[in-house]
């Protein structure tokens, strides 16, 4: 074997090893790359009990039930499917029915998602992209989804002296 053939063999072998390593890394990260799975995706993937993942969607209105010792159950929906969630702990301040949520945990044998972490949305206009796309595709999308509700104006009355004093301080 000449020097040139040996060099090409070594370079080809190194490229092959790098390609195999990249393939193994991408295969291992395949499920981790997705930030969360929607209930429809969970049903399609047939995720088995005990496998940890993130579940995202909207808290189904009327599904929130509080139990003893901070135990809470609710359903997460994406417009196509619903998944029951059980959580024991303090819920975030922004958590409420009809709002976006991401929970981390695993399914149990009964098909209930046992969450050990629950995150509520931060932005008033937030809706997971997959949920919005699913709602649009199924024809359930409403233009007011994801928009903040305006607060009801209360009675405001200022006397003339207070108006000028308030205007002077601004």
Swiss-Prot record:
Topological type in the membrane: Single-pass type II membrane protein
Transmembrane spans: 8-28
Ranges per topology, Periplasmic: 29-170
An MF annotation (GO) of this entry: heme binding
Spans within the Cytoplasmic topological domain: 1-7
Basic and acidic residues bias locations: 137-146
Any one of the GO CC terms: plasma membrane
Binding, heme: 122, 126
GO biological process: cytochrome complex assembly
Chain positions covered by the region annotation Disordered: 137-170
Pfam families: CcmE
Location in the cell: Cell inner membrane
Keyword list, A-Z: Cell inner membrane, Cell membrane, Cytochrome c-type biogenesis, Heme, Iron, Membrane, Metal-binding, Signal-anchor, Transmembrane, Transmembrane helix
Coiled coil ranges: none
Function: Heme chaperone required for the biogenesis of c-type cytochromes. Transiently binds heme delivered by CcmC and transfers the heme to apo-cytochromes in a process facilitated by CcmF and CcmH.
Family to which this protein belongs: Belongs to the CcmE/CycJ family.
Record protein name field: Cytochrome c-type biogenesis protein CcmE
Name of the coding gene: ccmE
């Amino acid at each position: 074997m000449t020097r040139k053939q040996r060099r090409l063999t070594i370079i080809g072998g190194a490229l092959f090893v790098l390609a195999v390593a990249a393939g193994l890394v991408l295969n291992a990260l395949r499920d981790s790359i997705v930030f969360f799975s929607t209930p429809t995706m969970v049903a399609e993937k047939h995720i088995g009990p005990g496998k940890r993942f993130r579940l995202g969607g909207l808290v189904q209105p009327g599904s929130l039930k509080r139990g003893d010792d901070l135990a809470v159950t609710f359903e997460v929906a994406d417009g196509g499917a619903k998944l029951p969630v059980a959580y024991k702990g303090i819920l975030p301040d922004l958590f409420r029915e009809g709002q976006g949520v991401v929970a981390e945990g695993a399914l149990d044998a009964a098909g209930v998602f046992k969450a050990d972490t629950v995150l509520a949305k931060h932005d008033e206009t937030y809706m997971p992209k997959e949920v919005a796309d699913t709602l649009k595709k199924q024809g359930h999308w409403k233009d007011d989804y994801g928009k903040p509700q305006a607060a009801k104006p209360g009675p405001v009355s200022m006397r003339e002296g207070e108006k000028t004093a308030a205007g002077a301080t601004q």
